[in-house]
UniProtKB/Swiss-Prot annotation:
Cellular-component GO terms for this entry: cell surface; chylomicron; extracellular space; extracellular vesicle; high-density lipoprotein particle; low-density lipoprotein particle; synapse; very-low-density lipoprotein particle
A single BP term in Gene Ontology: cholesterol efflux
Signal peptide: 1-20
Keywords: Chylomicron, HDL, Lipid transport, Phosphoprotein, Repeat, Secreted, Signal, Transport
Family (UniProt): Belongs to the apolipoprotein A1/A4/E family.
Residues found modified as Phosphoserine: 333
The name this protein goes by in its record: Apolipoprotein A-IV
Region (Disordered) residue spans: 354-391
Assembly behavior: Homodimer.
Swiss-Prot/TrEMBL domain comment: Nine of the thirteen 22-amino acid tandem repeats (each 22-mer is actually a tandem array of two, A and B, related 11-mers) occurring in this sequence are predicted to be highly alpha-helical, and many of these helices are amphipathic. They may therefore serve as lipid-binding domains with lecithin:cholesterol acyltransferase (LCAT) activating abilities.
Length: 391
């Protein structure tokens, strides 16, 4: 199955560590993305994927990602392959069972909530309003910081570019030695500003998650008296909602970080090019400075437009998730895919636990001791054993 190739490639890149650092969340992302892709594909497409020559694809992907596969990667593959295959198979088998149990939970909750529909709707309305009040300042602050940080970066870098251009025009003697300090300071200021962007703009995911937890706990405590006899089911559904909402906080942090990395990736070569042109003719250096000056404005604007709306989009996504949950408690029209968040939550917990176990047992400098086949099977069985939903 093609899923196996992709999952194992990313996981191997993760734990070898010397070529790239990938977290258990990223490994779980790959597994979940391909699980949903297979679930959504037509039957013929799934069958075609299952017939794919995994061995050849796996070897190709390993070469692309890791170069020469080392002994540690080989050892890791032998442990991770059975787990990934078993877990993906378990996930597929569990889908229908979890779907039925989640639908039953919602039906029981609806039976309790429907007589109090107006009160429940008011509780959700009040809760959403409080959530927006807590999150709106973050979106406003994010936009303000973007403008301040990017303007400050341009204000610090532009004078160095202009000084170097002026030095070229004045035909200063010993041009190269005169320009080196400016070029070095330009690079240093650029690096400092990029680190400043990362420190100031990367969302405080843990703080956002704490806000979500507090908001949902307030809602749960208000709904609890209306869920007499089914409070455990209410708690379970609230856990699923919390997982979805906190996942948005993590995605927000990833999007901001990705955009900062992209800005650095676009501008860093231009800064390096200025330094490399110091040993050449003045025409090449002048063009390099012009390119940097032009791209600095353009790339900062692209970055600003990409990141500024993220705070508001995050807030809107949380409100939509709250509204969807309210609808699920009021009718049976919104719970078609509500089981998926529970499947994903379960998958991420199991991948995190398994990866943590592997990392404790080995390192790139000390290869993992390969288990016997029956030990692998036992470990996989323990990891993928489903947790029964509380009734």
């Amino acid at each position: 199955m093609f899923l196996k190739a992709v999952v194992l490639t990313v996981a191997l890149v993760a734990i070898t560590g010397t070529q790239a650092e990938v977290t258990s969340d990223q490994v779980a992302n790959v597994m979940w993305d391909y699980f949903t892709q297979l679930s959504n594909n037509a039957k013929e497409a799934v069958e075609q994927l299952q017939k794919t020559d995994v061995t050849q694809q796996l070897n190709t992907l390993f070469q692309d990602k890791l170069g020469n596969i080392n002994t540690y990667a080989d050892d890791l593959q032998n442990k991770l392959v059975p787990f990934a295959v078993q877990l993906s198979g378990h996930l597929t088998k569990e889908t229908e069972r979890v779907r039925e149990e989640i639908q039953k939970e919602l039906e029981d909750l609806r039976a309790n909530m429907m007589p109090h529909a107006n009160k429940v709707s008011q509780m959700f309305g009040d809760n959403v309003q409080k959530l927006q009040e807590h999150l709106r300042p973050y979106a406003t602050d994010l936009q303000a910081q973007i403008n301040a940080q990017t303007q400050d970066m341009k204000r610090q870098l532009t004078p160095y570019i202009q000084r170097m251009q002026t030095t070229i025009q004045d035909n200063v003697e010993n041009l190269q030695s005169s320009m080196v300090p400016f070029a070095n300071e330009l690079k240093e200021k650029f690096n400092q500003n990029m680190e400043g962007l990362k420190g100031q703009l990367t969302p405080r995911a843990n703080e956002l998650k704490a806000t979500i937890d507090q908001n949902l706990e307030d809602l749960r405590s208000r709904l609890a008296p209306l869920a007499e006899g089914v409070q455990e089911k209410l708690n379970h559904q609230m856990e699923g909602l919390a997982f979805q909402m906190k996942k948005n906080a993590e995605e927000l942090q990833t999007k901001v970080s990705t955009n900062i990395d992209q800005l650095q990736k676009n501008l860093a070569p231009l800064v390096e090019d200025v330094q490399s042109k110091l040993k050449g003719n003045t025409e090449g250096l002048q063009k390099s400075l012009e390119d940097l000056n032009k791209q600095l404005d353009q790339q900062v604007e692209v970055f600003r437009r990409a990141v500024e709306p993220l705070g508001d989009k995050f807030n809107m996504a949380l409100v939509q998730q709250m509204e969807k949950f309210r609808q699920q408690l009021g009718s049976d029209s919104g719970d078609v895919e509500s089981h998926l968040s529970f499947l994903e939550k379960n998958l991420r917990e199991k991948v995190s636990s398994f990866m943590s176990t592997l990392q404790k047992k080995g390192s790139p400098d000390q290869p993992l001791a390969l288990p016997l086949p029956e030990q692998v099977q036992e470990q996989v069985q323990e990891q993928v054993q489903p947790k029964p939903l509380e009734s």
